[in-house]
Each structure stands twice: as C-alpha cells, then as structure tokens.
Amino acid sequence: MTAPDADGPWLTDEQQSVWRVFLAVQSLLPVALDAQLSREAGLSHSSYIVLALLSEAPDRSLRMSQLAQSVTMSPSRVSHAVARLEERGLVRRERASDDGRGNRAILTDQGMEELVAAAPGHSAEVKDLVFGGLTPEQLTQLGDVLSVMESRLRTRQANRVAPGRSGGNRRVT
C-alpha cells in the first residue's frame, strides 16, 4: 500500500497524528474544566459559559434561541441548563417583551456573584491547561489556526439548510 496522497480521501500520517491529538484535547479539556468548576464553584462548564454569556449581554439577558446559538447547544439542552441555574436562583426566565413569543434568560445578581467568584479559578485553569507552556509565537499560531477552523465551521453551519416552519426549506442565517 502506498502512502496517502495529501489530496486523496485519506489522512496523511501527519494529519492523522494531529487529528488524534486534537480529539484527545477536545475530549480531555472539557472534563478537566468541568472538574475544576464543580470542585471550586459547584458549576458545570456549560453552566459557567451560560452565566458568562449572560453577564456580557445587554441587561444581562438573552433570548433562549440566541443563548443556544452562542453556546452551540441544542435548544433543549440550553433549556435544561437554564432550568438548573434557575433552581439555584442564578438565572430567571421571562417572556420576551419585544414579541412575547419567546423566553429570555436573565442573569440574577446572585448568578453574577457566583460567576465573579468562579472566574479566577476558571481563568487560572484555562491559563494552565490551554496556554501553559506555549511561547508567545505558539500562542499566536494557535489563535491563527483556531480562527481558520472556526471560520470554516461557521460558514459550513450557516450554509446548511434547515426545515422551515411552513414545511419548506430555508437557509439558516
């Protein structure tokens, strides 16, 4: 068997090696971040991200659909995450006032306090696990590589066709 062609359907040995490292990081990093946040703040990483996104939004509020898009979770998964945060008093839900059709998730003062308390430990863990040991040049390269990947993924996602409410198809934007 000959070596895979860079333009052929199979990954080259180098691509396969990089892909496996990427998969390992993609698997190990969320587990490590979840463990740190759970241990120190009683939060999952996805809950932390929801709180952080709400803290950065105008009026600390986002429509549930916007929140789902921002965290790249399914609407039902976001709804469950928000329900758990709501039970703890960290978030509340209200009917969207602009059209009354959807719900908004709103970060409470208690939620903001818990986010602020959790942030230093989370930031330290991210600095250690993601950026620790990288030179300034490697950090720049990592940012460049991830930006290219994100752009390609977002373009692909935006170009997918989703079923429309009327039974036809529409472009997802």
Where in the sequence are the language-model features?
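Short, locally clustered residues in the helix-turn-helix/winged-helix DNA-binding domain
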Residues: 23, 52-56, 119
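N-terminal positioning helix adjacent to the helix-turn-helix/winged-helix DNA-binding module
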Residues: 14, 46-48, 110, 138
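N-terminal helix-turn-helix DNA-binding core of bacterial DNA-binding proteins
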Residues: 31-74
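C-terminal regulatory/oligomerization modules of transcriptional regulators
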Residues: 1-13, 136-173
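Short, hydrophobic-biased segments on the C-terminal half of alpha helices
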Residues: 64, 82-83
